[in-house]
């Protein structure tokens, strides 16, 4: 026996008692089933705040019940339940997946012996009366023998032997059980000997249904209460969370007003339309391994792997003392591992800052794809004299965050980051359908475009701890600031043009792509010069245009010029 | 290897394994377990006979991130105290000024940070037993005993240990290539090296090799069967453990031990241990 049963509950008869009560309740529930269903209906209706005529429902169901032939005159009473030997439950196989749909599934063998069950009820022996009661008034002849004749009946099932192989599925919502290979045997004894063979025959026939349908559904319903502790409250909480979710969605749904439409930059719209139309061709230019895409600044899906393989990671980290210009990021190992070469340690060639920034970057990129952890967990454990008290909070966040809740970012970029994240994820999903239309707001569109093409770090995700010092160093770089104007707010067209040009100028000539250059571990990246997005002011809207670059191509994309021909 | 660990002495100390087991069990009985777990205890603990290698790689000033974190925290607490009419956001210079007004930690000469390489590939093993309990219809009605034997723990990482303003920061920085461990990984990987690169790049895995052997169920009076080596369960536990560590102690997350004692305690001597 793999499962251990608490023997005490069998010895002190408490298990038998609870089972007897439950069975009594269950067996009588059939009679009151209709009423119960009505209750549920009306309950649901009330919750849905639609007033439905409960009276009507009740009356109709009563009629339906009356029209059934019912020979039971009183409730079914379970007199005795006894398990003299403890049932045996063995686990034969186990599979754990950890997914909410199916947390675990297992195969179990159940066997029990010598069990005893005795039920008692009263039946109506005058079956003519039963028919008379349900037949319509106009039927003839009228019965004279319309007295009731109630007979008590006791049925005893003894020596119950059950052996079954069951499949058990544990889900978030409850436990599902299916019975296979059931072998059941029992001695049946009825107080009315005349009926015994007939009842026994019918019982054996209906046993299949019991194990196939009745028991699994009963167990599932029962288990739902274990998983949700108290069913009603959990119901409301899930409802609540759903409401919350829909409210959030409503909150972040884009509304395009006339004012917004004025803000849409024609340049961006042009670029976006080029992008979409290029997807409609069968051009194979972009499959050339050397280039990421035919459209500058964008990444084609088939080159994604090529692109990600050049992301900074410790395997292609060349150490701190390397010359930045010579440092060419090579395609790192295929095993998708982020390991610091041991040789670097041996040569004591460790650039701590570079390692830190790479690890932070990878972490942030993980956020953008998984969307689960937003802020790194930084637990604080206060150590006092002898005893430890673990303050279960993620660093300086307010104390109302409990340990299990997702940590919210507290750094100054909080607002911008989270809102951009949600907008991005929302618009990305809707992108496929609305790609061609120009109805959504331009800023969000373009940012979602870039993110749908390459799941890089959310662009507003500033490296959390870069602060004042960086700001100062940046102020010196007026050109970058110029382009910052573009990112921080949407100004008139003139400004956009200016920023486009200026951002173009700031590009290194060997950096083919703006985004790529941010990702690559060039010297620029490793050195403490912050990336653009680390000082975007938090509450401003901003957008990222993935196409802000054009150097060595013939079809230069300045505003004054014609857009490139569609490929 | 910078630190010489006298492992032989530890290993020969027969009492040690027992005391460690007792200490851990004492701790496990003191914590509150969820209602479906019962009887969690360490059954066996063995130190193994191979010592971990600890190498000190760098001693430097602590990185700015730690100061930022402390300052941010101070700021938050200060804001909470002076919380009044003003409740708008964190941006802007105003808050920063206020932070300076209240309290700010600056780098001091006593602050220090160690970059330590830790390597372990020994044969330490722990056996844990627990019972999954079904509290229905009566309390502890049915129990499923589970025994886990954890062994073959291997890691090779760089960690950052910083001490500043009476706080100790600890974080796993990155994994280091290791011929033995890397080979282990490829064997354990079911999909093979080519297919495994589907997911996003893993920042760090800290525990690179780990074997868990499971036993589910228990024989009762020589009756019934015990389910051994449940592969899916082992994989599941491994992933959970890795995820947990990565989430909690891998850079940019860290653990912060605060040794600071507020002065309102009876003792006003600042102890640092």
UniProtKB/Swiss-Prot annotation, chain A:
Residues 392-416 have a biased composition (Polar residues). GO terms for biological process: mitochondrial genome maintenance; mitochondrion-endoplasmic reticulum membrane tethering; phospholipid transport. GO terms for molecular function: lipid binding. InterPro entries: Mdm34, SMP_LBD. It is found in: Mitochondrion outer membrane. Residues 417-452 have a biased composition (Low complexity). Residues 1-224 form the SMP-LTD domain. The keyword Transmembrane applies. Residues 392-453 are annotated as: Disordered. The keyword Mitochondrion applies. One of its GO terms (cellular component) is ERMES complex. Keywords: Lipid transport, Lipid-binding, Membrane, Mitochondrion, Mitochondrion outer membrane, Transmembrane, Transmembrane beta strand, Transport. Disulfide bonds: none annotated. It is a multi-pass membrane protein. Lacks alpha-helical transmembrane segments, suggesting that it resides in the membrane via beta-sheet conformations similar to those predicted for other outer membrane proteins and porin. The SMP-LTD domain is a barrel-like domain that can bind various types of glycerophospholipids in its interior and mediate their transfer between two adjacent bilayers. Component of the ER-mitochondria encounter structure (ERMES) or MDM complex, composed of MMM1, MDM10, MDM12 and MDM34. Component of the ERMES/MDM complex, which serves as a molecular tether to connect the endoplasmic reticulum (ER) and mitochondria. Components of this complex are involved in the control of mitochondrial shape and protein biogenesis, and function in nonvesicular lipid trafficking between the ER and mitochondria. MDM34 is required for the interaction of the ER-resident membrane protein MMM1 and the outer mitochondrial membrane-resident beta-barrel protein MDM10. Belongs to the MDM34 family. This is Mitochondrial distribution and morphology protein 34. It comes from Vanderwaltozyma polyspora (strain ATCC 22028 / DSM 70294 / BCRC 21397 / CBS 2163 / NBRC 10782 / NRRL Y-8283 / UCD 57-17) (Kluyveromyces polysporus).
UniProtKB/Swiss-Prot annotation, chain B:
One of its GO terms (biological process) is mitochondrial genome maintenance. Residues 76-98 are annotated as: Disordered. Its main location: mitochondrion. GO terms for molecular function: lipid binding; lipid transfer activity. It is found in: Mitochondrion outer membrane; Endoplasmic reticulum membrane. One of its GO terms (cellular component) is endoplasmic reticulum membrane. Residues 78-90 have a biased composition (Acidic residues). Residues 1-260 form the SMP-LTD domain. PROSITE patterns: SMP. Keywords: Endoplasmic reticulum, Lipid transport, Lipid-binding, Membrane, Mitochondrion, Mitochondrion outer membrane, Transport. It is a peripheral membrane protein. The SMP-LTD domain is a barrel-like domain that can bind various types of glycerophospholipids in its interior and mediate their transfer between two adjacent bilayers. Belongs to the MDM12 family. Component of the ER-mitochondria encounter structure (ERMES) or MDM complex, composed of MMM1, MDM10, MDM12 and MDM34. A MMM1 homodimer associates with one molecule of MDM12 on each side in a pairwise head-to-tail manner, and the SMP-LTD domains of MMM1 and MDM12 generate a continuous hydrophobic tunnel for phospholipid trafficking. HAMAP family: Mdm12. This is Mitochondrial distribution and morphology protein 12. It comes from Vanderwaltozyma polyspora (strain ATCC 22028 / DSM 70294 / BCRC 21397 / CBS 2163 / NBRC 10782 / NRRL Y-8283 / UCD 57-17) (Kluyveromyces polysporus). The gene is MDM12.
């Amino acid at each position: 026996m793999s499962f251990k049963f608490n023997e005490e509950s069998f010895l002190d008869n408490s298990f038998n008692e609870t089972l007897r009560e439950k069975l009594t309740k269950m067996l009588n529930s059939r009679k009151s089933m209709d009423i119960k269903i009505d209750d549920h209906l009306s309950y649901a209706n009330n919750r849905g705040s639609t007033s439905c005529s409960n009276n009507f429902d009740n009356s109709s169901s009563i009629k339906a019940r009356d029209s059934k032939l019912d020979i039971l005159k009183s409730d079914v009473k379970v007199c005795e339940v006894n398990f003299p030997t403890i049932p045996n439950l063995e686990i034969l196989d186990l599979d754990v997946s950890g997914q909410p749909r199916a947390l675990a599934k297992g195969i179990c063998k159940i066997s029990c012996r010598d069990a005893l069950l005795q039920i008692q009820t009263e039946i109506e022996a005058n079956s003519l009366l039963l028919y008379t009661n349900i037949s319509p008034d106009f039927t003839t002849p009228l019965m004279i023998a319309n007295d009731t004749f109630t007979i008590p009946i006791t049925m005893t099932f003894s020596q119950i032997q059950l052996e079954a192989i069951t499949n058990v599925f544990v889900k978030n919502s409850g436990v599902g059980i299916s019975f296979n290979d059931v072998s059941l045997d029992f001695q049946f004894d009825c107080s009315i000997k005349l009926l015994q063979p007939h009842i026994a025959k019918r019982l054996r026939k209906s046993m299949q249904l019991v194990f196939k349908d009745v028991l699994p559904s009963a167990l599932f319903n029962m288990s739902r209460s274990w998983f949700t502790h108290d069913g009603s409250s959990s119901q409301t909480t899930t409802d609540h969370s759903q409401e919350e979710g829909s409210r959030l969605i409503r909150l972040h749904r884009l509304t395009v007003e006339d004012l917004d439409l004025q803000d849409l930059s024609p340049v961006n719209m042009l670029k976006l339309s080029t992008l979409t139309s290029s997807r409609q061709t069968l051009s194979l230019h972009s499959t050339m391994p050397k280039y990421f895409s035919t459209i500058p600044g964008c990444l084609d899906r088939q080159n994604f792997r090529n692109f990600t393989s050049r992301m900074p990671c410790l395997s292609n980290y060349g150490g701190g003392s390397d010359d930045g210009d010579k440092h060419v990021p090579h395609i790192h190992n295929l095993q998708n591992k982020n390991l610091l070469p041991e040789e670097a340690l041996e040569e004591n060639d460790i650039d701590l800052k570079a390692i830190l920034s790479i690890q932070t970057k990878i972490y942030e990129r993980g956020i953008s794809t998984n969307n689960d952890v937003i802020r790194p967990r930084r637990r604080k454990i206060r150590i006092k004299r002898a005893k430890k008290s673990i303050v279960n909070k993620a660093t300086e966040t307010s104390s109302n965050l409990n340990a299990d809740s997702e940590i919210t970012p507290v750094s100054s970029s909080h607002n911008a980051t989270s809102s951009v994240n949600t907008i991005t994820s929302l618009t990305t999903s809707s992108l496929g359908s609305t790609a061609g239309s120009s109805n959504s707001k331009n800023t969000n569109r373009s940012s979602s475009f870039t993110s749908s093409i390459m799941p890089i770090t959310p662009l507003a995700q500033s490296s959390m701890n870069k602060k004042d010092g960086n700001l100062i160093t940046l102020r010196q770089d007026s050109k970058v600031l110029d382009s910052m104007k573009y990112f921080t707010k949407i100004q008139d067209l003139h400004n956009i043009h200016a920023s486009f040009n200026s951002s173009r100028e700031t590009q290194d000539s060997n950096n083919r792509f703006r985004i790529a250059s941010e990702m690559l571990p060039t010297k620029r990246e490793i050195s403490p010069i912050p990336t653009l997005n680390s000082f975007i002011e938090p509450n401003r809207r901003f957008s990222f245009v993935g196409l802000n670059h054009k150097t060595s191509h013939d079809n230069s994309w300045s505003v004054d010029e014609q857009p490139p021909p569609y490929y | 290897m910078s630190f010489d660990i006298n492992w032989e002495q530890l290993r020969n100390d027969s009492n040690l394994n027992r005391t460690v087991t007792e200490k851990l069990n004492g701790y496990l009985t003191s914590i509150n377990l969820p209602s479906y777990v019962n009887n969690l205890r360490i059954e066996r603990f063995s130190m193994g006979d191979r010592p971990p290698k600890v190498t000190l790689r760098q001693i430097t000033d602590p990185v700015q991130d730690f100061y930022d974190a402390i300052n941010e925290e101070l700021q938050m607490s200060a804001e909470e105290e002076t919380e009044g009419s003003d409740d708008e956001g964190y941006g802007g210079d105003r808050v920063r000024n206020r932070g300076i007004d209240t309290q700010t930690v600056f780098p001091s000469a006593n602050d220090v940070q160690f970059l330590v390489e830790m390597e372990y590939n020994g044969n330490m093993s722990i056996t844990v037993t627990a019972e999954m309990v079904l509290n229905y219809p009566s309390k502890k009605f049915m129990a499923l005993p589970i025994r886990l034997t954890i062994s073959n723990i291997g890691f090779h990482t760089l960690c950052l240990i910083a001490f500043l303003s009476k706080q100790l920061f600890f974080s796993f920085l990155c994994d280091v290539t290791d011929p033995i461990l890397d080979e282990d990984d490829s064997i354990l990987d079911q999909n093979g090296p080519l297919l495994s690169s589907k997911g996003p790049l893993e920042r760090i895995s800290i525990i690179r090799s780990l074997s868990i052997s499971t036993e589910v169920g228990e024989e009762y009076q020589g009756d019934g069967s015990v389910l051994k080596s449940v592969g899916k369960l082992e994989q599941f536990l491994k992933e959970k453990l890795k995820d947990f560590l990565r989430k909690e102690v891998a850079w940019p997350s860290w653990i912060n031990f605060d040794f600071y004692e507020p002065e309102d305690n009876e003792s006003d001597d600042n102890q640092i241990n």
